[in-house]
């Protein structure tokens, strides 16, 4: 059964601990983002790993190639399962990131590495006016996806709305990791390109990241099980 990735959008380990305790020791897939990592440092990864959870470390690195390479050497040593960069950093940067992960992993298992295409909070209008990208949103996402594949990365972060086109372009094994997932009863909040877990499954996502629909639910375990059911029907 494919597990959804739970976005641990908290500031403190105490909040994380209280949340994870609700799942009675079940091994989960979780995302540690900027808020949690920058507030607590690398120790937060170690503490969560001790509970046998898989970790997607979502720091979206974007810098010159050598800096990203050096950073990835360090991140690989944390023992996380997946990391990411911004595809906008370019092919050379992504290749350097991959090289850094391989160096940092040594003889151990290398974390998967994926690249962010366009954020799910980005609309086509804002992309065109603020980023001065004059293509369609889909064309931009496909361009970044092809670049990511050429650099040898495992896949991309994308909206589920682009997942099938990315699959057709890059093959079924190329990961399409999809945030912006909400249960039908939940508000979209600051996300724009959102879908339900069921729709994400039907239109080509390989992995889904779910935050507020689970973490802010009155009963997080029940919400998680609902997401799990929709994602695996």
From Swiss-Prot:
EC number(s) in its UniProt entry? 4.1.1.23
Respond yes or no to whether keyword Lyase is given for this record.
yes
Instruction: List the Gene Ontology MF annotations in alphabetical order.
Output: orotidine-5'-phosphate decarboxylase activity
Gene Ontology process terms (BP): 'de novo' pyrimidine nucleobase biosynthetic process; 'de novo' UMP biosynthetic process
Q: Which UniProt keywords apply?
A: Decarboxylase, Lyase, Pyrimidine biosynthesis
> Which InterPro entries does the entry mention?
Aldolase_TIM (IPR013785), OMPdecase (IPR014732), OMPdecase_AS (IPR018089), OMPdecase_bac (IPR047596), OMPdeCOase_dom (IPR001754), RibuloseP-bd_barrel (IPR011060)
One GO cellular component this record assigns the protein to is:
cytosol
Q: Which reaction does it catalyse?
A: orotidine 5'-phosphate + H(+) = UMP + CO2
Q: Which top-level group of life is the source organism from?
A: Bacteria
Q: Hey, which family's this protein in? A: Belongs to the OMP decarboxylase family. Type 1 subfamily.
Output this protein's name.
Answer: Orotidine 5'-phosphate decarboxylase
Give residues annotated as binding substrate: 9, 31, 58-67, 120, 182, 191, 211-212
According to its UniProt record, in which pathway does this protein act? Pyrimidine metabolism; UMP biosynthesis via de novo pathway; UMP from orotate: step 2/2
């Amino acid at each position: 059964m494919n597990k959804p990735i739970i976005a641990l959008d908290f500031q403190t380990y105490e909040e994380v601990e209280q949340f994870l305790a609700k799942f009675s020791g079940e091994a989960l897939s979780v995302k540690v983002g900027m808020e949690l990592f920058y507030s607590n440092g690398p120790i937060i990864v170690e503490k969560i790993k001790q509970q046998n959870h898989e970790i997607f470390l979502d720091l979206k690195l974007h810098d010159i190639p050598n800096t990203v390479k050096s950073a990835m050497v360090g991140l690989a040593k944390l023992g996380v399962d997946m990391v990411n960069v911004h595809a906008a950093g370019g092919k050379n940067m992504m290749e350097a990131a991959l090289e850094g992960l391989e160096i940092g992993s040594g003889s151990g298992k290398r974390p998967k590495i994926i690249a962010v295409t366009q954020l799910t909070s980005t609309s086509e209008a804002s992309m065109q006016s603020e980023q001065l990208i004059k293509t369609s949103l889909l064309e931009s996402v496909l361009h970044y996806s092809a670049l990511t594949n050429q650099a040898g990365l495992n896949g991309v972060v994308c909206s589920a709305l682009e997942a099938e086109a990315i699959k057709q372009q890059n093959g079924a094994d190329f990961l399409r990791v999809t945030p912006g997932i909400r249960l039908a009863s939940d508000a979209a909040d600051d996300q724009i390109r959102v879908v339900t877990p069921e729709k994400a499954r039907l239109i080509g996502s390989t992995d889904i990241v779910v935050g507020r629909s689970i973490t802010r639910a009155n009963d997080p375990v029940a919400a998680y099980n609902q997401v799990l059911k929709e994602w695996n029907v």
